[in-house]
Amino acid sequence: MDVGGALDLYGCSVNVYNAILIFIWVLFLWETYINLRQLKVAKRVTESPEEIKCLMNDVDFDKSRRYAIDKMNFDIVSGFYNILSLSAVLYFQLIAWAWHKSQEHMLFVCSYAPRSFGTTEGSEILFSLLFTVYVALFQFFESLPWSYYRHFVIEERYGFNKQTIGFFIKDRLKSLAVGLVIGLPIISMLVWIIKAGGHYFYIYAYGFTFVVSFIIMFIYPEFIAPIFDRYEHFPDCELRKKIEELAASIEFPLKKLYVVEGSKRSSHSNAYFYGFGKNKRIVLFDTLIKGFKMPGVEADSSANADESSDETQNRGCGDDEEILATLAHELGHWKLKHMTFNLIIAQINIFFMFFAFGQLINVDQLFVDFGFPPSTAPILIRLIVVFQFIFMPYSSVLEFLMTMLSRKFEFQADAFAVSLKSGEKLKSALLVLTKDNLSFPVYDWLYSMCNHSHPPIIERLAAIDAKMGKEK
């Protein structure tokens, strides 16, 4: 196979294809190495650490250990498949093949359409849209068996999966449809902006993505998330009153409080907030609250009887103060402006990537190695090659740094909850969630450093104790 020539970079001859292929395999081997380190820890440690024995006995610990081993083995095998698949895409120049097929099929369709429909000026956008659909369909079918195994074998084995096969397929199809409905217009506009924007197109492209990102941040929780899960206003009760008092005590502008029926798909629990300015919402998963029933569930309880179990009903925090402590942690992210900081970093990163793309867009040799002769690579392909492959080392380093920053933010949010006198309840809530989610509490330091955006439970408990000691 012809993989193109070499790129002259500051007097050095660099084969782009070989460099990318070497990097993705080095990255895969590194990730496999640290996964094997963690797998070794999970197999070696067979007794619950003293710090969490008060809640997780050896039986529960062994179950969490087996769960961790199963997930780790799955990640290693699926990772090996993914690297083989990506290598095949590069080696056989399948990106170019898919693009040419998109051209052929779109030209065939246009031959039966009005003459103006397939004009040369707009044809690249049409080709880009069909190419995107083909890639989305390929990824949909390629990931389907892996997702099925994760949910219906691993998650099912440990009592987490609550989806039926019908729900699973429908959920995946909805994700595909929503992704295309949102993604295709964005791709159309982005290709048009880059083609028409001249030398400073990267400024206009960044401005467009900036606006789109804020629009999506607004419409996703209000209009898109309810497509996948049922959201209800949190019922009037003592817990609701306490949550509103907590929000008011730190001047959090809470406008609405929701509960989401996460139990329909999984027993895992969560809580989060969203919104702009003085229009914030808090969302609690029904699985976070022990014994919680979604409004109206009694009316169809017989139909859903098989979807719930005593084990599921016994999961979650049974103490209101534990739930409040969990929310105090989440609201700490808002009070300490972590979300704003992350948003600023994201915008700087997007602008930098578009600026760098502006310097590389006309370096034809980058795209020859992907099967496109000089000056023939379309805009969308140039975006994919540069953003996904050329920037891969940069993106990997940035991802690691953001993981480290996230860990720091988690410690700070825990400390904020302690400052609200919720330290002990936060500890007990973390222990409950660790047990309920079968989170294996012992980690290899290198694996944890590279993979955990949230610190391990033992580190968090120690930090909370240290903070409470200083507060006394």
From Swiss-Prot:
Its cofactor is Zn(2+). Residues 1-8, 97-124, 197-207, 362-382 are lumenal. Inhibited by ethylenediaminetetraacetic acid (EDTA) but not by serine, aspartic or cysteine protease inhibitors. Inhibited by high concentration of Zn(2+) (> 0.1 mM). Optimum pH is 7.5. InterPro entries: CAXX_Prtase_1 (IPR027057), Peptidase_M48 (IPR001915), Peptidase_M48_N (IPR032456). GO terms for biological process: CAAX-box protein processing; proteolysis. This is CAAX prenyl protease 1 homolog.
